[in-house]
Amino acid sequence: LDSKTKNELIFASITVSGTSISTISNSEGNFSIKIPTEKQNSSLIITFLGYNNKVVAIKELKPEKNVLYLEPSNTMLEEVVVNVRDAKNIFLGVLSSRLQNYGNEPIQMTGFYRETIRKRRTYVSLSESIVNIQKQPFSTVKQEQIDLFKGRKNADYIKLDTVNFKLQGGPFSALFLDLIKYPNFIFSEHAFDLYDFSLEDITQNNDNQVLVLAFKQKPTNENPLYYGKMYIDVNSLAVISATFHLNVADKAMAGLQFTRKKPVGVDVYPTEVRYQVNYRQENGQWIFAYSRGDLTFKLNWDKKIFNTIYSTSFEMAVTDWKKQDTKEIQNTQKLTSNIIISDKVSSLADPDFWGEYNIIEPEKSIESAIRKIQRKTLNERSID
């Protein structure tokens, strides 16, 4: 929580000191983290953009219901302006500094992935999985490999009505939000022909000053592009976080980017598309840590008075990592970039399913949906 306003700090990074074990707070500011017995003398390090880092000894924490407060950082604008030439040069500096900021070696990561689909306010699909990722450096065109370690799901196809609404890409959708590895997701080599850049604000990340670089598509470009903000460390010019939205003003054009196939007589278009990606500093370099997408679609039927609203969210947090060995994933659980994860994993039932693995603590609405699913599954088993 913010120490002054007591507001929740969402998507804050939580790391066990001296290790690569980590998680992230959810959209309600809550988190849980599983700590090995041999690390009980370590500390938790909580970081959040615009705040001083919080370090707390694990032994001082209760098993649950701890409340932690972070202090807002003080920004000294005058010291930064002297060193900033213009927004265009800042972005060029980001691109030219990628090697020193993000390294050139592959990394073996463990990640937790969750995706949900709601029909209006009701959850109709929930999928979660632990994945092993062979994360490739930005300097190679080689795509990441993802191995499904374990996962669970539930989908209520009755509530899905006549549309079998599914999210394609699974964990790859989250990885493709890595703007350092995949800059063409937003920025091509002609970025300055497509976007206007501006220096919007200056904040802090612990003791380091951070530039807030805003971007939006040029008004002369009619194709749906993105608008948003990048948060850039002023000393290294590393992107430490970014939030961005798709311009959905042209419904038909925006809809073409997402709809693979649809029934005859229905128009599908997005009403909101929002993405976020965070990076974490480890041993002087920044690595991919978390990403999230929130998308809302409207379905208009030719012969129906009312439309249908579907909302889908996906997120992935890196919970552990190490230097990668040279072996590629060779088993049958290797995922492809067009995977539909809800078709790949088993039913949601066991409340202790994740064991020792760290996950993103579910929001209250998701937690309630999980409990309902587990009760329903247990009732069905008892009837059988």
Question: Predicted segments — roles?
Answer:
Residues 1-9:
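Structural motif
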Residues 31-33, 64-66:
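Short strand-edge motifs at loop-to-beta-strand transitions and within beta-strands
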Residues 183-234, 238-245:
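Extended beta-strand-rich segments in extracellular/periplasmic secretory proteins, especially
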Residues 45-56:
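A short, solvent-exposed loop/turn motif at the edges and junctions
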Residues 33-41:
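Short Pro-Gly-centered beta-turn/loop motif in secreted/extracellular proteins
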Residues 20-30:
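Short, acidic Ser/Thr/Gly-rich low-complexity loop/linker segments typical of extracellular
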Residues 66-196, 206-209, 259, 264-384:
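Surface-exposed, low-complexity/disordered segments
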